[in-house]
């Protein structure tokens, strides 16, 4: 399931250090010649494709990327220190454009691909360079150049790592809203989600994954009923399915029958999809007393003879969602997608 994510960021390379105006001053050498050193080059900003980075979410928190300035030159022919380059990891498949001109700067396709997006300013020259037979005490220096600065647009075709399963109104949209920046339409009636929504879940710095909420499935979806059939095929590209189950349905329906209906649709649509790793997530546990919720969850597990991972959450109250997201991140890192 591919979606285009984008981010905007300003990059500023470091300025070059200025050249030094200095003369040799030592005992018994009253008229020492020039000894001003050169400045250091400014640091550049590089993007590097890193397979451990999945999304552009980091650029929502850091909109300015700045490399170090070069240090000025010093006396005794000492050069200034070069500014440190700024190396920024980006996901594989990132495309970089100049925001103002829409010029394509480059693509980062394979792990280790490196792209200079702002080059550091060239160092200035000390007065030593301007000594001549007619000018033994030059007072001329050259200042360091300014580093490049530009506004960039980054694009990434996202491949969803986790897909959400569940009947309409199971709470999938509420869940994706609770754990990510996605804002799907949420209401208490079936088919609230009319098209896929994508959310980026940020667990820690440079640890994030992509989760997709598709329209709720109903019985017969694999044959064209409801809204989910045209999106079922996209779930085959995900690594893991979260089966969201409403344990307190307002219509009094049986959660076990709801789960079995979804499983049946998966099996009819694709054997590969039905065998994909799937975790059971009981939602809306806040609507029941704790002992009743526990008993109902256990009853469902027993009736299904479920052997896989089980989580109990309240998406609307964000109860249990943090642990689930950390476990999802660990699973995805352990079973990293081959690109």
UniProtKB/Swiss-Prot annotation:
Q: Provide the residue positions that the database annotates as binding Mg(2+).
A: 173, 193
Q: Which UniProt keywords apply?
A: Cytoplasm, GTP-binding, Hydrolase, Magnesium, Metal-binding, Nucleotide-binding
Q: Where is the OBG-type G domain?
A: 160-333
Q: What class of enzyme is it?
A: hydrolase
Compartments (UniProt record): Cytoplasm
Tell me the protein's name: GTPase Obg
Q: Which PROSITE patterns match?
A: G_OBG (PS51710), GTP1_OBG (PS00905), OBG (PS51883)
Q: Name one GO biological process term.
A: ribosome biogenesis
**CDD domains the UniProt entry points to:** Obg
Q: What cofactor does its activity depend on?
A: Mg(2+)
Enumerate the InterPro entries for this protein.
Answer: G_OBG, GTP-bd, GTP-bd_Obg/CgtA, GTP1-OBG_CS, GTP1_OBG_dom, GTP1_OBG_dom_sf, OBG_GTPase, P-loop_NTPase
* Keyword Membrane among record annotations: no
Which EC number(s) does the record attach to this protein?
A: 3.6.5.-
SUPFAM superfamilies recorded for this chain? Obg GTP-binding protein N-terminal domain (SSF82051), P-loop containing nucleoside triphosphate hydrolases (SSF52540)
What residue stretches are annotated with the Obg domain? Answer: 1-159
Record's PANTHER family?
Answer: DEVELOPMENTALLY REGULATED GTP-BINDING PROTEIN-RELATED (PTHR11702), MITOCHONDRIAL RIBOSOME-ASSOCIATED GTPASE 2 (PTHR11702:SF31)
The UniProt annotation places GTP binding at 166-173, 191-195, 213-216, 283-286, 314-316
Just give the chief location class.
Answer: cytoplasm
Which cysteines bridge via disulfide bonds? Answer: none
